[in-house]
Regions:
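N-terminal, positively charged/glycine-rich alpha-helical extensions of SAM-dependent methyltransferases
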Residues: 1-26
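A generic alpha-to-beta junction signature in SAM-dependent methyltransferases
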Residues: 49, 70, 134-135
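A short glycine-rich, Lys/Arg-flanked "PGG" loop and its adjoining helix->strand segment in the class I
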Residues: 126-142
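Conserved alpha-helix/loop element of class I SAM-dependent methyltransferases that forms part
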Residues: 32-54, 64-65
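A short acidic, Gly/Pro-enriched loop at the edge of an enzyme's catalytic core
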Residues: 108-118
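Class I SAM-dependent methyltransferase SAM/SAH-binding core
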Residues: 54-108
Length: 146
């Protein structure tokens, strides 16, 4: 396929895609991250995550993946920096009681020292010094990157 043809295909797809947050359901059935990879990020997290743990999701997108974990909302926090997703998180996560704060994963996190038992980050920026700062002693950091 020639470059112009590919660009035309992408433009057509973009015009019909309804992307909100980190929801790419418009490509459902064409690619499945969970089955096309030799690991399952969600299962890895769930192997460690316990209901009493305090969880932070850095760069949560629209919060879809975070919500799929079904962790107690009062023990759940999230950050996001992309303006459309910030608004989406305010509308979806805050009403549930999730502690959502606008912020970029590569900068200083807007949380106290040693606040979290587990920090996750899926395809987002992160700062290892900040991860270390907000994790409790013996805490767990799990990330999946492109």
């Amino acid at each position: 396929m020639k470059e112009k043809e590919l660009i035309d295909i992408w433009k057509r797809e973009e015009s019909v895609a309804h992307i909100h947050g980190w929801d790419f359901s418009h490509i459902e059935g064409r690619y499945t991250e969970e089955t096309d990879l030799p690991w399952n990020y969600q299962n890895i997290i769930l192997d460690y995550l316990k209901p009493e743990m305090k969880l932070l999701d850095i760069d949560t997108g629209g919060g879809e993946f975070l919500l799929s974990l079904r962790h107690p909302y009062v023990k759940t926090s999230a950050t996001e920096a992309y303006p459309p997703n910030i608004q989406l998180c305010k509308e979806t996560l805050l009403p549930l009681g999730i502690d959502f704060r606008a912020g970029d994963g590569k900068d200083m996190l807007p949380f106290d020292d040693y606040e979290f038992d587990i920090v996750i980050n899926r395809h987002g920026d992160f700062n290892t010094k900040e991860i270390h700062r907000v994790l409790k002693c013996g805490g767990i950091f799990i990330t999946e990157q492109v």
